Amino acid sequence: MIYASKGNFEMACWLILASMILDGLDGRVARLTNTASKFGVEFDSLADVVAFGVAPAMLLYFYIGIDYGRLGACVPAIFVIFGAVRLARFNITTSSEPNFFIGLPIPSAAVVVMLWVLIDLEYKLIENYNYGYVMLLGSFIISILMVSNIRYPSFKKMQWNFKSFIAVILLLGIVYVNPRETLCVLMSGYVVYGILRWLVLIIKVRFSSKLTKDKNT
């Protein structure tokens, strides 16, 4: 948040990514050391609101929102509010690690926003193509996805075998060569996958109900 307010946007972005990595480790460390507690769960949620709600919202505001008046202030505010709602819903509906998430996870939402900023820092899309409104609109859509009922896959219980291990190694190699572009494609693809899967399910349900109705008539 401090780096974003001072205009050091690249460092602010990488710190958000570091927060996501550490967030994936803290629960496992607590279980391995047998130090998991209800207090830890609630405190972790508070940390998530700050790291993945407030921090990316401030990054978004100081990077682009500050130039768009009330609209530029509203979108980051909505991001924080919907992110907090997403975490609250997760805490009351999840008793164990699920195979999927209901709504886009707030860490993923935060990383998508910060990757858009990183890409713009590299290619100057806002400066050259007036990309600002697109970024604000995209961030608003990301906020909506956090509180939606769209299911996103969870990789916490992924079955590790030789093929998956090799795939992860190759993926890490690609990320190492082109970290910004690769991560942006992967995370944006994750967001789009949930939407496409939701649309396919809706089409299947409607088609199935139509077939059933036709058979009954």
Show which residues each predicted segment covers.
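Membrane-embedded alpha-helical segments that form the functional core of polytopic membrane enzymes
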Residues: 1-42, 73-80, 138
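Helix-coil boundary and interhelical linker segments in multi-pass alpha-helical membrane proteins
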Residues: 1-14, 54-74, 115-134, 177-181
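Residues within membrane-spanning alpha-helices of integral membrane proteins
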Residues: 13, 17-20, 52, 76-79, ...
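Hydrophobic transmembrane-helix microenvironments that flank and shape a buried ionizable site
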Residues: 20-23, 41, 45, 80-83, ...
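Juxtamembrane membrane-interface segments at transmembrane alpha-helix termini
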Residues: 25-32, 84-92, 196-208
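Multi-pass membrane catalytic core of lipid/isoprenoid biosynthesis enzymes
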Residues: 32-87, 116-118
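C-terminal membrane-associated helical module and adjoining short loops/tails
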Residues: 98-217
